[in-house]
Amino acid sequence: MSHIDQINFIKEFKDYYINENFNLNIDVLEIGSLDVNGKIRDLLNFSKKYTGIDLIKGPNVDLIMDGSDIDQLNRKFDIVISCECFEHAKNWKTIFEKMCNVAKDDSFVVVSVASTGRIEHGTERSGNWQSPGNKDDYYLNLTKKDFE
């Protein structure tokens, strides 16, 4: 998570859906949790059960795992969230499906992706430091149509 639009999106989600009466024992799963230049966990600090996964070990990563393997965790979550990862993953559709599968009934699946107008980043051509651990060397801006 790196820019103000992403931060504001997560803050708005939290402000709109999470209030003082919300159960603080909710279980959160974040896909792509490595702290490259900011972390969602700080914005969702109300949760006492938070699991962050990413492709490599590093700050804010609890488990090293591909997002397409999250069903192997054998549990369901109240919030399943991924910010700015799908545009770097060839298998983003599988990851999204798995996110929906591991979400509890009446839960939240929250996704933020790079879209139209965002310049390529996180590849060998553009500087892969923005997508550490990604071996796909893949980039695609996504739109609403991609999810339909």
Model feature map: region roles:
Residues Y50, E87, K104:
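A short glycine-/small-residue-rich loop at the edge of a beta-strand within enzyme catalytic domains
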Residues E30, S82, V111:
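Redox-cofactor binding/interface segments in oxidoreductases and associated redox assembly factors
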Residues I79-C85:
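A short beta-strand submotif of the Rossmann-like class I SAM-dependent methyltransferase core
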Residues V36, C85, A114:
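Flexible loop residues that form catalytic
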Residues I64, C85-F86:
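Alpha-helical architecture
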Residues D69, E87, R118:
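Active-site micro-motifs of SAM-dependent methyltransferase domains
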Residues K90-E148:
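S-adenosyl-L-methionine-dependent methyltransferase catalytic module, highlighting the catalytic core
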Residues M1-R75, I79, K135-K144:
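Conserved N-terminal segment of class I S-adenosyl-L-methionine
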